[in-house]
């Protein structure tokens, strides 16, 4: 059974009834509370909104308002999603959203219980993170043409993403104020507002300097770069003086992968982050240090990379030990 693509899910959502006003108000209150309490990003809040609106539209008031749904109603919805070929990972994410939402409903006095706690968590596969080899990374980083301001900017972005293990959302929203060129470090505000400091290597600092001194003024046509709605001046800009989108960077990295002779379907922004982590471990990095660099809340999230590192050591042993 092939999971639905993003476009298929959106098309299916458009076929559902419109959102009832009461449910729309409930979802809006919940998202406002999440933002105030946890400072979640707009991207995360939009994911929560889509999941809750999908359930509300499917229910369409049949089993009562969204905040009063029972375990059987939620189970019916999860069963329907499975029949519509939603992946176990997508259903697991939905269940996590529902647990948070119904906990909020209990806090607000809308109900006395959390019905989602009675639902079984989907069994998930555990795919290992995919990483590029170090030679593939070198080819990918060298793919942009540095003869143009856009190419020089993109080279700097690729270098920075690999050097610091950034998420794509962290890269494209990075403010100038977060870069300390004198000390060679970045201050990153990651998921859930978690802050971390990431050191930069000589190569990434070199390309950042070239971008800031050559490409950025050219892209801005020497005009002052305005602050965005958050009051931050973006580090990486386009010719309209605005920050770049995640989708733009996604397309570029696929393009540069093809130029580097790497299958585009094997490369994504997150693959660069996985490569950063894998290569550090292969060269002897400490797992706790890697956790801090990646901004993981729990060491268990970071531990998946240890299996990849063990594979690397086994390969080295098999290649070089006289009795392997």
Swiss-Prot record:
**Alphabetical list of Pfam families matching this protein:** Phage_int_SAM_1, Phage_integrase
One example of the protein's molecular function in GO is:
tyrosine-based site-specific recombinase activity
Subcellular localization(s) per the UniProt record: Cytoplasm
Q: Which GO terms describe its cellular component?
A: cytoplasm
Task: Identify the main location.
Answer: cytoplasm
| Active site residues per record | 167, 191, 270, 273, 296, 305
Keywords attached to this Swiss-Prot or TrEMBL record, sorted alphabetically, are: Cell cycle, Cell division, Chromosome partition, Cytoplasm, DNA integration, DNA recombination, DNA-binding
The chain positions of domain Tyr recombinase read 127-318
Can you supply a Gene Ontology BP term from the record?
cell division
PROSITE patterns per the UniProt record, alphabetical: CB, TYR_RECOMBINASE
Entries under InterPro entries matching the protein: CB, DNA_brk_join_enz, Integrase-like_cat_sf, Integrase_catalytic, Integrase_recombinase_N, Integrase_SAM-like_N, Recomb_XerD, Tyrosine_recombinase_XerC/XerD
Question: What sections of the sequence does the record tag as coiled-coil?
Answer: none
What HAMAP family does its record include?
Recomb_XerC_XerD (MF_01808), Recomb_XerD (MF_01807)
Q: What does this protein do?
A: Site-specific tyrosine recombinase, which acts by catalyzing the cutting and rejoining of the recombining DNA molecules. The XerC-XerD complex is essential to convert dimers of the bacterial chromosome into monomers to permit their segregation at cell division. It also contributes to the segregational stability of plasmids.
Q: What else is known?
A: During infection by the bacteriophage Xf-phi-f1, it may be required by the bacteriophage, which may use host proteins XerC and XerD to integrate the bacterial genome.
What is annotated about its quaternary structure and interactions? Forms a cyclic heterotetrameric complex composed of two molecules of XerC and two molecules of XerD.
Task: Identify its protein family.
Answer: Belongs to the 'phage' integrase family. XerD subfamily.
UniProt name for this protein: Tyrosine recombinase XerD
* Name of the gene this protein is made from: xerD
């Amino acid at each position: 059974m092939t999971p639905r693509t993003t476009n298929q899910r959106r098309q299916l959502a458009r076929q559902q009834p419109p959102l009832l006003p009461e449910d729309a108000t409930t979802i809006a209150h919940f998202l406002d509370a999440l933002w105030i309490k946890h400072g979640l990003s707009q991207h995360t809040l939009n994911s929560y909104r889509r999941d809750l609106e999908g359930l509300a539209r499917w229910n369409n008031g049949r089993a009562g308002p969204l905040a009063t749904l029972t375990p059987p109603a939620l189970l019916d919805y999860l069963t329907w999603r499975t029949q519509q070929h939603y992946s176990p990972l997508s259903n697991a994410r939905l269940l996590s959203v529902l647990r948070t939402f119904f906990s909020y409903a209990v806090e607000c006095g809308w109900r006395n219980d959390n019905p989602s706690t009675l639902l079984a968590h989907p069994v998930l596969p555990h795919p290992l993170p995919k990483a590029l080899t170090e030679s593939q990374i070198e080819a990918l980083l060298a793919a942009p043409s540095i003869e143009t301001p856009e190419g020089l900017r993109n080279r700097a972005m690729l270098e920075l993403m690999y050097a610091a293990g950034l998420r794509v959302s962290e890269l494209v929203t990075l403010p100038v104020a977060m870069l300390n060129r004198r000390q060679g470090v970045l201050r990153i505000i990651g998921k859930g507002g978690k802050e971390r400091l990431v050191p930069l290597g000589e190569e990434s600092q070199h390309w950042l300097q070239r971008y800031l001194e050559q490409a950025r003024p050219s892209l801005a046509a020497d005009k002052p770069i305005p602050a965005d709605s958050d009051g931050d001046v973006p580090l990486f800009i386009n010719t309209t003086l605005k920050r770049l989108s995640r989708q733009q960077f996604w397309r570029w990295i696929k393009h540069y992968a093809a130029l580097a002779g790497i299958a585009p379907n094997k490369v994504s922004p997150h693959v660069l982050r996985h490569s950063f982590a894998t290569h550090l471990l292969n060269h002897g990095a400490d797992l706790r240090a890697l956790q801090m660099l990646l901004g993981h809340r729990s060491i268990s999230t970071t531990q998946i990379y240890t299996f990849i590192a063990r594979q690397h050591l086994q390969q080295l042993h098999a290649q070089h030990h006289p009795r392997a």
